[in-house]
């Protein structure tokens, strides 16, 4: 597929243009057929592009937006009062067909509320959910939901499993992704009523490859392709994982810097350490998909660096190339036709 167009919320995130513009430059250099609609305050975007010598780049088009959704703004306030925000206009561009996807590092709650209002959910889906990758011993696994819904019933968790499974089938060409339900133990007697009801629904659905309960350590074992949980638990697990990865890398760096002997050992181990850093670096897994919408929306971590935001853009490109929305919609329609979804 050529001429992919992505709308970028250029003003969102903790760092705004300082990170977004360099990341966009990296993305277009890697993708000659990629066009980016940079949404935000025109003068500021122009100045940033000029600073990086990219003002005349044909792969960039500036779309002016006079407002910015702040990171601490209430979603309801952003939805009602920020109709000319960079976030809102970027999502509108997807609805209007001028962009095939949207990427934002902005306020998660506001992004979810705005995307749901503008794009609407797919038939059979009550709530969108956030899904992203985590590194494992054997490669990677995906986790859904990572914070879109902090209180989900069994029916919603079942819908998350359907959407996550469809995403993996589309992107990784796996016909039967292994699905695990996050719980405090693998025994059937463990868990609250919500988890037990979800487990029963998944077990009764022969269409999906449900393998049972998984515990927190299964995030990294690679035993399953998709871990299903509510957004409260998923978000806590994600942030804890990112913190642990940073701690491990920091401790290793300090350990090899203690004296001349450890510095020599560090030089010898440098190739292995670089490999470890690449495997664990959270920026390499940045870019979470908002599944269940009539359009592609990718959420970048608010504090992402250039590499991280670039990965979020490339995640959007990947989803466009693989027609993720259409494939998820087809999967959901199959479930509706079989009476598995209402």
UniProtKB/Swiss-Prot annotation:
SUPFAM superfamilies per the UniProt record, alphabetical: Isocitrate/Isopropylmalate dehydrogenase-like
- Molecular function terms from GO: phosphate:acyl-[acyl carrier protein] acyltransferase activity
Which Gene3D superfamilies does the record match to this protein?
Answer: Isopropylmalate Dehydrogenase
Q: One GO biological process from the UniProt record?
A: phospholipid biosynthetic process
Entry GO CC: cytoplasm
Q: Which UniProt keywords apply?
A: Cytoplasm, Lipid biosynthesis, Lipid metabolism, Phospholipid biosynthesis, Phospholipid metabolism, Transferase
What this protein catalyses is: a fatty acyl-[ACP] + phosphate = an acyl phosphate + holo-[ACP]
- Localization: Cytoplasm
Q: What is its EC number?
A: 2.3.1.274
Identify the pathway.
Lipid metabolism; phospholipid metabolism
Question: What InterPro entries does its record include?
Answer: FA_synthesis (IPR003664), Phospholipid_synth_PlsX-like (IPR012281)
- Its EC top class is transferase
Function, as annotated: Catalyzes the reversible formation of acyl-phosphate (acyl-PO(4)) from acyl-[acyl-carrier-protein] (acyl-ACP). This enzyme utilizes acyl-ACP as fatty acyl donor, but not acyl-CoA.
- How does the annotation summarize its subunit structure? Homodimer. Probably interacts with PlsY.
Q: What family, per the record?
A: Belongs to the PlsX family.
Query: What is the protein name for this chain?
Result: Phosphate acyltransferase
Q: Which organism is it from?
A: Legionella pneumophila (strain Corby)
Instruction: Write the gene name.
Output: plsX
């Amino acid at each position: 597929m050529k001429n992919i167009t992505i709308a970028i919320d250029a003003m969102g995130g903790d760092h705004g243009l300082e990170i977004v513009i360099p990341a966009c430059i990296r993305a277009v250099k890697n993708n000659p057929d990629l066009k980016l609609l940079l949404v935000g305050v025109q003068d500021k975007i122009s100045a940033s592009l000029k600073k990086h010598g990219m003002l005349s780049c044909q792969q960039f088009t500036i779309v002016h937006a006079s407002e910015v959704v702040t990171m601490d703004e209430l979603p309801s306030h952003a939805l009602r009062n920020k109709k000319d925000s960079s976030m809102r206009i970027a999502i509108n561009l997807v609805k209007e067909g001028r962009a095939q996807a949207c990427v934002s590092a902005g306020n998660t709650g506001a992004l979810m509320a705005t995307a749901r209002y503008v794009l609407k959910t797919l038939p059979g889906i009550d709530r969108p959910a956030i899904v992203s990758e985590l590194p494992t011993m054997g490669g990677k696994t995906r986790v859904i939901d990572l914070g879109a819904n902090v209180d989900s019933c069994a029916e919603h968790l079942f819908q998350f499993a359907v959407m996550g499974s469809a995403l993996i089938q589309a992107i990784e060409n796996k016909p039967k992704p292994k699905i695990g339900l996050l719980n405090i133990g693998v025994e059937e007697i463990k868990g609250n009523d919500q988890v037990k009801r979800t487990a029963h629904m998944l077990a009764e659905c022969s269409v999906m490859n449900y393998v049972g309960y998984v515990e927190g350590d299964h995030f990294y074992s690679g035993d399953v392709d998709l871990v299903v949980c509510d957004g409260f638990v998923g978000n806590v697990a994600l942030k804890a994982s990112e913190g642990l990865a940073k701690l491990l890398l920091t401790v290793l760096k300090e350990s090899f810097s203690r004296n001349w002997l450890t510095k020599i050992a560090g030089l010898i181990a440098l190739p292995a350490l670089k490999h470890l850093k690449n495997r664990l670096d959270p920026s390499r897994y940045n870019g979470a998909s908002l599944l269940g919408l009539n359009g592609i929306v990718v959420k970048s971590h608010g504090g992402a660096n250039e590499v991280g935001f670039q990965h979020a853009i490339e995640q959007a490109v990947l989803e466009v190339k693989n027609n993720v929305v259409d494939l998820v919609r087809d999967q959901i329609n199959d479930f509706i036709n079989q009476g598995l979804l209402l």
